[in-house]
């Protein structure tokens, strides 16, 4: 076998790597000076494979937490959803009733609360808010870590809750989509997880998607860049100038993704 050097093909750092290393399923000498046959996750300190190792560990920890909360192993579809989340991807849960969309979302919010990370659960009705909070208590989330709003709150109690909201004194926020519409300016930014139950009703109110993105830490400018990229990509006939703009906007979006990315 003739030894070759492949430029920018190291699966971990994107640098140069020899054909011998690739044949053995290893990374380059820079990432791993000494060849090992054991699990690479035990040796690598940085890079894309290191990130995948961390994600795999995070998914396994969530799986154990889910089983403890629900009493059974998560479905393969729920594991796929968890993988998408820990890969920092936004997505819609498209599945029939009873598959476990709500159990997935609430177990993930409870799991993140253990790590001091904040979640916002948006529901269509107050009744579902109460049911959700009760379920979160059952998952082991302490009462003082959950903030929710109901129609039975007394004036003093509601004002105290609003102060907690403004100060960010919670780990899980559970409200209706109408509450989001009315109190958007009072809700702090920078949530780690945003879970919308019954997204159809959520989309009936204009600009809810924009508000959700802003709550996750994106700016109006970020959203405008994404919309412009979508508009250009949807054009049937693109000029060279269009392609140049698309490439420039795509690079900006990559930078925004890195800026807003979360490490677990």
For the regions a language model picked out, list residue spans one by one:
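N-terminal helicase ATP-binding lobe
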Residues: 1-264
């Amino acid at each position: 076998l003739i030894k070759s050097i492949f430029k920018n093909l190291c699966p971990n750092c994107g640098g140069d790597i020899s054909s011998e290393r690739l044949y053995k399923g290893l990374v380059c000498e820079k990432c791993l000076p000494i060849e090992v046959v054991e699990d690479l996750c035990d040796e690598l300190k940085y890079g894309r494979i290191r990130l995948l190792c961390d994600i795999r560990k995070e998914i396994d920890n969530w799986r154990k937490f889910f089983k403890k909360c629900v009493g059974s192993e998560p479905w393969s579809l729920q594991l796929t959803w968890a993988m998408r989340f820990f890969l920092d991807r936004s997505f819609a849960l498209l599945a029939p009733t009873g598959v476990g969309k709500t159990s997935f979302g609430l177990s993930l919010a409870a799991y993140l609360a253990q790590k001091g990370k904040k979640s916002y659960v948006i529901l269509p009705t107050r009744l579902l808010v109460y049911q959700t909070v009760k379920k979160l208590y059952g998952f082991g989330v302490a009462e003082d870590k959950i903030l929710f709003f109901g129609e039975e709150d007394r004036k003093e109690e509601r004002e105290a809750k609003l102060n907690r909201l403004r100060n960010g004194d919670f780990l899980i926020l559970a409200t209706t989509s109408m509450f989001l519409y009315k109190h958007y300016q009072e809700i702090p930014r920078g949530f780690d997880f945003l879970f919308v139950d019954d997204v159809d009703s959520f989309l009936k109110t204009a600009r809810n998607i924009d508000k959700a993105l802003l709550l996750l830490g994106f700016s109006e400018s970020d959203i405008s860049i994404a919309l412009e990229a979508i508009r250009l990509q949807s054009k049937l006939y693109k000029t060279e100038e269009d392609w140049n703009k698309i490439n420039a906007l795509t690079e900006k979006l990559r930078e925004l993704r890195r800026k807003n990315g979360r490490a677990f």
